[in-house]
Amino acid sequence: MFYPIHFDVIVVGGGHAGTEAALASARMQCNTLLITHNIDTLGQMSCNPAVGGIGKGHLVKEIDAMGGSMAYAIDQSGIQFRVLNSSKGAAVRATRAQADKILYRQAIRSILEYQKFLLVIQASVEDLIVSGNKIVGVITPKLGMKFSGTSVVLTTGTFLNGKIHIGMNNFRGGRSGDSESSSLLSERLKELSFQISRLKTGTSPRVHTKGINFGSLRAQYSDDPIPVFSFIGSTKLHPTQVPCYITHTNNKTHEIVRSNLYQSPMYTGLIKGIAPRYCPSIEDKITRFSDRNAHQIFLEPEGLTTPEVYLNGISTSLPFCVQMQMIKSIQGLENACIIRPGYAIEYDFFDPRDLKLTLESKIISGLFFSGQINGTTGYEEAAAQGLLAGINAARFSKNKEGWYPRRDQAYLGVLVDDLCTHGTEEPYRMFTSRAEYRLSLREDNADLRLTEIARQLGLIDESRWKAFCCKKENIEKERQRLRNTYIFPYSSDVAQLNNFLKTPLTHETNGEDLLRRPEINYKKLSQLSTFSPSILDRQVFEQIEIQIKYEGYIRHQQEEIKRHIYNENTLLPTDIDFNIVSGLSQEVIDKLNNYKPYSIGQASRISGITPAAISNLLVWLKKQGLLEHNTC
């Protein structure tokens, strides 16, 4: 039986990818259905209770700049906020927040339930309805219902044929304590010619606070002033702030782990999936870094109303009894009791090279993939993909062309280009080092890069748009004021200025030129009567300071970006057989026919595609009269 309503967009899965996908589609006024196996776990933090970090925080800011909900939800639920790399350059500074996982889940659910054009139904999708090579709906056998939709977004997380391992014991599941995972959807996708592989991730044990000796641990508090994640957020939204704590493993811990590797499913061959390189288990740490005598552990409270503490840094799939021994060997945890054991989980994912940069399948029209199903790891990577998939599923339902950001526009652009061009053989996570234009892709300017685009896409409401325009206007007005305001060697406050300078002022200088000096910042400048009154909005004055201090470097990078955009906008025919292009080696032809790059830029990033091959492609395009550029 078919549900009586036809949906523009159907989103399968209520994790971080699914919630952002559904919200994006609904904000674009598409009739949207979100199907989740459990409404009570919408926005659940399955692993560590935190949002952000290096590279990841940049993605969260971009999601927020485009009207997404992750940043605003963490502002309502964050119990410790810090800026990582705060002493380094602006490009690599990253916000991170410890979450009250209960408050976070409540915030996400509230946003979903009050979103217009969105219906949430609790059910399990186990099959797709496909007509020819086009998606037309989904099937929920246990509900006995079929749902028709113009487009479908799959955000299945680790629930796609998931298997949980604790020691030699394993069982079907996508998350410990949740319902069983299903292999039926995986099998259906395999029938449709999708390339399937296995990945592995893991989680750390949770312990009870009453057994922790906090007095022997180092506390780590929120920064002062406390950071805010959302561009429309405020510290007034933050709940009570509490510290995290730091301890370390030791030789005794390592010996316990080493002597029990024979009981580790990773080291006995039970687990076939590839683990994340940048989030290794404690078994991997001790094996790969055998010269280390200690590994850092962060004790992260899971909330203000729960006694659970997440032990970040010792992800493990060792037997429960071994985990207990291991925990009790660590300083401060000698009397700690495990509430939930750590575990490893294997799950299916599909080759993201079978996707367009819009995250639409190249195989089935109207079918979109986002999150861990594409081989990524992390809440932030999933949420960013969900946003993009939701945008494009909505545009597909309206017969509009898809949209995606370039590598020079957003970390999201880097993420999807990496996945769709190179694929991945291990869980992919974002780092600032993956972005060649990271000086232009800072956290602080995510809204300046993306909010206008999001407004055009229909994601930004009127109140948010007015706030953005006001901020942008204030930045320009203040820069203009600083540019036109001069201080002289004989000014009344020059002595105060000279206290800040390495060498005394000898000639008239305006505010912008003073800010270019490394020893001067906006706060110091605003102490001088010449440059009063100053802007109080932190977002505004920090943006002004960064723009001025990095102006020369940014200008140089913009020249590089212009060349990059030319190649990205030089399009290749979608139906081309590269055998007809003369001068290409067979290896190059095979790779180009396999990848089907959309542009010269994407072709140039495929491993083994030489500069000579790119030149041949450009010559061929010119001869065929196909040397056209996408002006989007």
UniProtKB/Swiss-Prot annotation:
A Pfam family per the record: GIDA
Cofactor: FAD
Sorted UniProt keywords: Cytoplasm, FAD, Flavoprotein, NAD, tRNA processing
Function: NAD-binding protein involved in the addition of a carboxymethylaminomethyl (cmnm) group at the wobble position (U34) of certain tRNAs, forming tRNA-cmnm(5)s(2)U34.
Keyword Oxidoreductase: no
Recorded family membership: Belongs to the MnmG family.
A single BP term in Gene Ontology: tRNA methylation
Sites where the protein binds NAD(+): 275-289
Assembly with partners or alone: Homodimer. Heterotetramer of two MnmE and two MnmG subunits.
Binding-site list for FAD: G13, G14, G15, H16, A17, G18, V125, S182, Q372
Matching PANTHER family: GLUCOSE INHIBITED DIVISION PROTEIN A, PROTEIN MTO1 HOMOLOG, MITOCHONDRIAL
HAMAP family xref list: MnmG_GidA (MF_00129)
Domain of life: Bacteria
Signal peptide: none
Cellular component, GO annotation: cytosol
Chief place of localization: cytoplasm
Residue stretches spanning the membrane: none
NCBIfam families the UniProt entry points to: mnmG_gidA
Protein's organism: Blochmanniella pennsylvanica (strain BPEN)
Subcellular location: Cytoplasm
Annotated GO MF terms: flavin adenine dinucleotide binding
Protein name: tRNA uridine 5-carboxymethylaminomethyl modification enzyme MnmG
